[in-house]
């Protein structure tokens, strides 16, 4: 008897649950139908051609606006970087008073330069007209290849040129001791902030006299006249002006790097 009552109770609960679910489903369906009629009253069909075309049109417009924004932003960024080329000439001279260069032997040939040897260095830097001392060079060369048929070497170089209060320029690339080479200008500070371009390295006397011509882009302003005097014709006999070598006030730039 108890078993029969339990069965009837379970059956009653099950029927009640099913009826509630059915009513909820019908109520939900009625809500959807009402929502659909509201769309129809507004003259909008969720699955009709007008709604689809409007949706596609809106999406297309949004995509076009997005593309236009990034296109114009990219052009603005590119065009905002100055592309005017400015030339700057400097002499790098090793006058034998800076204990430079040093040679760190990491290669496998103890009696000659070979792959892997490191050469840190620092030399004096003068304006192209040799009238003023501007600073120093400082950096590191890694020997990549000894070239006996040309009586020289190939280095991978990374170094900077310091110009006192004006800032500095950094370069990177190959340095060949037996011919002219170009290195990339990788950046700068001070008046050289944003600099890019390349620099031509001309070997005059290895490793004590070098002449550089920078072709600089990206500078916000013209280079100061103090740095851009007419360069002395490069030769193995060039020498800085006496007042520049003696670092007299008239022969140096402001707070020149020493």
Curated annotation (Swiss-Prot):
Highly expressed in fully developed leaves. GO terms for cellular component: chloroplast; plant-type vacuole; plasma membrane. Keywords: Chloroplast, Isomerase, Plastid, Transit peptide. GO terms for molecular function: allene-oxide cyclase activity. Its EC number is 5.3.99.6. The four allene oxide cyclase proteins (AOC1, AOC2, AOC3 and AOC4) are encoded by duplicated genes. They are very similar, and most experiments involving antibodies do not discriminate between the different members. It comes from Arabidopsis thaliana (Mouse-ear cress). It is found in: Plastid, Chloroplast. Residues 1-56 form a transit peptide. It is an enzyme of class 5 (isomerase). Induction: Low local and systemic induction by wounding. Involved in the production of 12-oxo-phytodienoic acid (OPDA), a precursor of jasmonic acid. It catalyses: (9Z,13S,15Z)-12,13-epoxyoctadeca-9,11,15-trienoate = (9S,13S,15Z)-12-oxophyto-10,15-dienoate. One of its GO terms (biological process) is response to fungus. This is Allene oxide cyclase 3, chloroplastic. Its main location: plastid. InterPro entries: Allene_ox_cyc (IPR009410), Allene_oxi_cyc_Dirigent (IPR044859), Allene_oxi_cyc_sf (IPR034871). SUPFAM superfamilies: Allene oxide cyclase-like. Belongs to the allene oxide cyclase family.
């Amino acid at each position: 008897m108890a078993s029969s009552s339990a069965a009837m109770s379970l059956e009653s609960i099950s029927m009640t649950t099913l009826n509630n679910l059915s009513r909820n489903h019908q109520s939900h369906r009625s809500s959807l139908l009402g929502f659909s009629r509201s769309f129809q009253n507004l003259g909008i069909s969720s699955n009709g051609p007008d709604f689809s075309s409007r949706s596609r049109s809106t999406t297309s417009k949004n995509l076009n606006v997005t593309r236009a924004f990034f296109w114009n932003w990219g052009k603005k960024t590119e065009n905002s970087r100055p592309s005017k080329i400015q030339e700057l000439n400097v002499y790098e001279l090793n006058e034998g008073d800076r204990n430079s260069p040093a040679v760190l032997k990491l290669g496998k040939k103890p009696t000659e330069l070979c792959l892997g040897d490191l050469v840190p260095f620092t030399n004096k830097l003068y304006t192209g007209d040799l009238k003023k001392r501007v600073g120093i060079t400082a950096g590191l060369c890694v020997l990549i290849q000894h070239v006996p048929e040309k009586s020289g070497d190939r280095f991978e170089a990374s170094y900077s040129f310091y110009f006192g209060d004006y800032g500095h320029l950094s370069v990177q690339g190959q340095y060949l001791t037996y011919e002219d080479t170009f290195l990339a200008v990788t950046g700068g500070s001070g008046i050289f902030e944003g600099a890019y371009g390349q620099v031509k390295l001309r070997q005059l006397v290895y490793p004590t006299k070098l002449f550089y011509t920078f072709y600089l882009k990206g500078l916000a302003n013209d280079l100061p006249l103090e740095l851009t005097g007419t360069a002395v014709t490069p030769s193995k006999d060039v020498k800085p002006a006496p007042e520049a070598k003696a670092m007299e006030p008239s022969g140096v730039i402001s707070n020149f790097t020493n």
